Amino acid sequence: LTGGSSRVTIVVHTHPDGDAVGSGTAMLGYLTDIKRKNAALIVPDSVPDSISFITKGFEPGSVIVFEDERLKAEEWINSCDLIICLDCNSFSRTADMETLLRKSTARKVLIDHHLNPETASFDLTFSKEGISSASELLFWILMETPEIEGDASRLPARCAASLLTGMTTDTNNFSNSVFPSTFEMASRLIEAGVDRDAILVSLYNNYRENRLRLMGFLMSGKLTITPCGVAFIILDKETQDRFDFKRGESEGFVNMPLSVAEVRMSIFLTQEDDIFKVSIRSKKGVSANDCAARYFNG
């Protein structure tokens, strides 16, 4: 599909996280550096400051924020002949971009690791649940391409760094959803020259002071642990205003209550206007997916 395309649009889910931005920029790097395609990554809304470093090193204008540059994004979607959707199982997760994407006559490819992929909307689907991240799934797909032939050192440097960054964020630095293939991916990329230490510094040692103070406030005053071992934290608008909260700064907070022996599941709710964004993590033997499907329509 990429071989027969001249103008490619890459899209990811709304409120993009590290895996979305990592896999999206990795695909962008592969298409532009290896396939010499005219390509752009379109994110529905802004990339959080905490992971914006992932987009550094990519050409100006190649990463488009739909809510900020709507006309430019619409032109890209309407004129492209291939759409690649990464890290989301349906166009419904692309917010205001959904209608444009569905109406497009371009061929469509899905690359994702979530449950229930909307395969009917795509010409080609790569879907695997037993894998750490969309970034890892994309890595193994790229390893099978004739340009790479299983040699990670042939990947463009910025593509390889994005892949390792995306996987690292989605596994919480190898804490969740890690498989033997995940370690093999990391090993190959590091052997190929990716600077993992630099990635970790950018991800985990580059926050604002307010984030640390917010974390302490939430854990001391907003954390509730039920008798059945479910922990939940609500980050309401008042607290967000108090600490000048920036989107993305609560990344990883949902994992913290799991350090308590009695906690089997952790739920983190973030107020956004008239809705709450929900993140769920659980320990082995307890299904976060089942909880999301039953109570949170996800």
Task: Kindly label every feature range from the protein language model.
Residues 17-19, 87, 112, 170:
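Acidic active-site catalytic centers that drive phospho-/nucleotidyl reactions
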Residues 57-58, 104, 120-122, 295:
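Short, structured coil segments at secondary-structure junctions
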Residues 18-24, 91-95:
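Short glycine/serine/threonine-rich phosphate/pyrophosphate-binding segments
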Residues 64-121:
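Active-site cofactor/cluster-binding pocket
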Residues 113-187:
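Short alpha-helices
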Residues 41, 108-110, 125-127, 230-232:
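Conserved beta-strand scaffold positions in the cores of enzyme catalytic domains, especially
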